[in-house]
Amino acid sequence: MPHQPPNSPLGAFLEALGEAQIKCILIGSMAAIRQGAPLMTVDYGFWVRLPERQYVKILAIVQKQGGTILARTLYELRDGTQVNAIFQPDGLDSFEIEFRRSPAGELEGQPVRILPLKRVIASKRAAGRDKDLAALPVLERTLRLAQRLKAPPPRRRKKERRLK
């Protein structure tokens, strides 16, 4: 994930979503990468809280910022960064529930919620696409390692303490 300057097109895009009061959650492989998964992807996937029929609001933001519309929900920002707007991801609860579950983070100087790795796994499993299924072993291993690192050290038994 390349570092971009503070006024990067991605930061400007996220800022414009915020100004338009369009909430979003970073999902998919990029959310997993932000949590330590050793994956590669070419786009940022954002679950947007917007009825799909109102996708033109996002198109307007992209065009105003000099971006290109590649498909109805896939955009290329002026520096080539690809953004995918997702309206109904597979395998997840409602936007409100997932938004509350998702910790606040920062992306290119802008606040953003990041879907927890466990939920990324659930979504990829439910989507069932070959590329998602292929990523599951890596994602599950990353989750196990992250949980192991967060776990408190095992308590020593009284007998072990006496031996010292």
Which sequence ranges carry the predicted segments?
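Compositionally biased terminal segments of proteins
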Residues: M1-K164
